[in-house]
């Protein structure tokens, strides 16, 4: 095709994504659009078609973004090329959303006609507005008995400030309103800007590792054209590769002759080393490079850190390779090697949140067959020492000696909790119990309230979300942003087994709750750790001071069984001998700590604050 034809083709391209809160029907709507445009035959169709990971189907959530090309013949008789980029809706995967929005010009905002706007909807809409996208509101699930489309239409206008007068009323499940949505995409979403004759600039928004073809890049072509045989160059590190194949996804990968401006597709170039590519990087041609890289993504900083250790120590290298492959298409995952006296060699990993951590752990165990032990998650503290240094600490075992600490700052988040009016009391009580400071409260409509608190991230990391759902019967929705660091009265608590510190069980706790938490954890460990041949004391200590103790009684063999009657001094001699043996055993004996013990540090949180 000459550049004139390519420019005409470019005018027919529409790139859009679907944004919504969890469970508002995003993946179902994507399924209907695929059916309506006959991208997928009814024989191949299955629910949640774009959620290709087993984990996504089981949990009913979207974790990874997906990009698909569809052809749609509009009412004006022209055929348009749609690129649908599916996005996750959960707070931990905001990074995935921001990446997919950077590859689009428009976004369909799906709002549940019964539930209205939720916290996550707002967060993702603001991301879309930051990227200057054209937003098309769609009110979904209008066939539900509790649906109230007019109320939701007003909510969209009042809370978000979008004109919802032309919002499509739809039911993705029943297939109502799908055609109107497609027509609105044609009319309202702008065609991609960009120049086909300019040097190639392609934004990498995702990548996957293929054992045969190496790293496969998913790209959005912003300027220029790329075809197989071209020599491409990464703009961040200058490395060059020969393109072996370009193509698009129609969920399946289909090879093409070229990808031109406005296209969304994949590029394979025999990239063998995982570290050579980075999501957010710009690809250009080696013989005619672009002058500057595209504006990438803001790098997300991990909020939660935990240690990951293979149960079998010879799997350490396998774990490293697995983490590198996961990092390819999950750029927000960070890791570095660490060692623990209790657990051996492993990695300290940074995650965006607890669900992210959970998903990574499950993917490592399923996709790479590695059995893992995970330590309790922790956040990044700023420790100011007496010699006026500031150290960032994400691992409790790296905390400096208490005598060197001047003060400690911990991260606070601004939490937005949307909840029906009747549960406001429960939400406030929970937030206060988690050391939260009340900021403000806005009424969205007669019944729904947006409550804003400043809460320490460390309190949210454990089980805030579960507690919030149970105290509001599942009605609350929740979103948080990093706010600031504040001084707090924090101490490091060590757990001693048989007089030895177990580094992997150390955790940071607020002074106020230290005594109760210490007491609860030693009692929990007493139940979990199996009895030994000798007595094992479990102690919780802050610095040198022991704040709680519990003993696991020794298992004991009845050495008097063979003495029927007989002399008492004979019995005493046998008992003394047993006692001496136990003493010797205790001096050299080591205690096996089961995996549950590490997790019990997490779940004790609730008991401490009842």
UniProtKB/Swiss-Prot annotation:
The gene is lepA. Its EC number is 3.6.5.n1. GO terms for cellular component: plasma membrane. GO terms for molecular function: GTP binding; GTPase activity; ribosome binding; translation elongation factor activity. SUPFAM superfamilies: EF-G C-terminal domain-like (SSF54980), P-loop containing nucleoside triphosphate hydrolases (SSF52540), Translation proteins (SSF50447). Signal peptide: none annotated. Its main location: membrane. GTP binds at residues 23-28, 140-143. SMART domains: EFG_C (SM00838). CDD domains: EF4_II, EF4_III, LepA, lepA_C. InterPro entries: EF-4, EFG_II, EFG_III/V, EFG_V-like, EFTu-like_2, G_TR_CS, LepA_C_sf, LepA_CTD. This is Elongation factor 4. Required for accurate and efficient protein synthesis under certain stress conditions. May act as a fidelity factor of the translation reaction, by catalyzing a one-codon backward translocation of tRNAs on improperly translocated ribosomes. Back-translocation proceeds from a post-translocation (POST) complex to a pre-translocation (PRE) complex, thus giving elongation factor G a second chance to translocate the tRNAs correctly. Binds to ribosomes in a GTP-dependent manner. It is a peripheral membrane protein. GO terms for biological process: positive regulation of translation.
């Amino acid at each position: 095709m000459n550049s004139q034809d390519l420019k005409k083709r470019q005018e027919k391209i529409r790139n859009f994504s679907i944004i919504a809160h969890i469970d508002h029907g995003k993946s179902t709507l994507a399924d209907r659009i695929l059916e309506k445009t006959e991208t997928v035959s009814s024989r191949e169709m299955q629910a949640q078609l774009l959620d290709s990971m087993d984990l996504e189907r089981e949990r009913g959530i979207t974790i990874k973004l997906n990009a698909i090309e569809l052809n749609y013949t509009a009412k004006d008789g022209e055929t348009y090329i749609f690129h649908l980029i599916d996005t996750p809706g959960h707070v931990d995967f905001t990074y995935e959303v921001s990446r997919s929005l950077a590859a689009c010009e428009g976004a369909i905002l799906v709002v549940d006609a019964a539930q209205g706007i939720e916290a996550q909807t707002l967060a993702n809409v603001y991301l879309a507005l930051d990227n200057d996208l054209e937003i098309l509101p769609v009110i979904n699930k209008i066939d539900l008995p509790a649906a109230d489309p007019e109320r939701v239409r007003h909510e969209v206008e009042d809370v978000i400030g979008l004109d919802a007068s032309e919002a499509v009323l739809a039911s993705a499940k029943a297939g109502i309103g799908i055609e109107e949505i497609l027509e609105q995409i044609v009319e309202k979403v702008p065609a991609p800007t960009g120049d086909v004759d300019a040097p190639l600039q392609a934004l990498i928004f995702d990548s996957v590792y293929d054992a045969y073809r190496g790293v496969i890049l998913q790209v959005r072509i912003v300027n220029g054209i790329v075809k197989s045989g071209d020599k491409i160059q990464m703009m961040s590190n200058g490395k060059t590769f020969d393109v072996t194949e370009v193509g698009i996804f129609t969920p399946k990968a289909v090879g093409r002759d070229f990808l031109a401006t406005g296209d969304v597709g994949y590029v394979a170039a025999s990239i063998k080393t995982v570290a050579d590519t980075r999501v957010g990087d710009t690809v250009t041609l080696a013989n005619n490079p672009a002058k500057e890289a595209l504006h990438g993504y803001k790098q997300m900083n991990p909020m939660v850190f935990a240690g990951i250790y293979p149960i079998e120590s010879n799997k350490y290298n396998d774990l490293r390779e697995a983490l590198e492959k996961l990092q390819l298409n999950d750029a927000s995952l960070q890791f570095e090697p660490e060692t623990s006296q209790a657990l051996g060699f492993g990695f300290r990993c940074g995650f965006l949140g607890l669900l992210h951590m959970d998903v990574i752990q499950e993917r490592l165990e399923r996709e790479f067959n590695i059995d893992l032990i995970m330590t309790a998650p922790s956040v990044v503290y700023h420790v100011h020492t007496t010699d006026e240094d500031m150290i960032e600490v994400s691992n409790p075992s790296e905390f400096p000696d208490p005598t060197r600490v001047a003060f400690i700052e911990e991260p606070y988040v601004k939490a937005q909790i949307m909840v029906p009016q009747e549960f406001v009391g429960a939400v406030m009580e929970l937030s206060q119990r988690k050391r939260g400071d009340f900021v403000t409260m806005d009424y969205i409509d007669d019944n729904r309230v947006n409550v804003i608190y400043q809460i320490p991230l460390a309190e949210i990391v454990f089980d805030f979300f579960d507690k919030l759902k149970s105290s509001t019967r599942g009605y609350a929705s929740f979103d948080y942003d990093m706010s600031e660091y504040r001084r707090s009265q924090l101490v490091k608590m060590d757990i001693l087994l048989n007089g030895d510190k177990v580094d992997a069980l150390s955790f940071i706790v607020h002074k106020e709750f230290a005594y109760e938490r210490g007491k609860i954890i030693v009692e929990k460990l007493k139940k979990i750790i199996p009895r030994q041949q000798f007595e094992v004391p479990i102690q919780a200590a802050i610095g040198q001071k022991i704040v709680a103790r519990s003993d696991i009684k020794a298992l004991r063999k009845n050495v008097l069984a063979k003495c029927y009657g007989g002399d008492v001094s004979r019995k005493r001699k046998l008992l003394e001998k047993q006692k001496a043996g136990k003493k010797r055993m205790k001096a050299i004996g080591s205690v096996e700590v089961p995996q549950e013990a590490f997790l019990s540090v997490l779940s004790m949180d609730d008991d401490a604050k009842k």
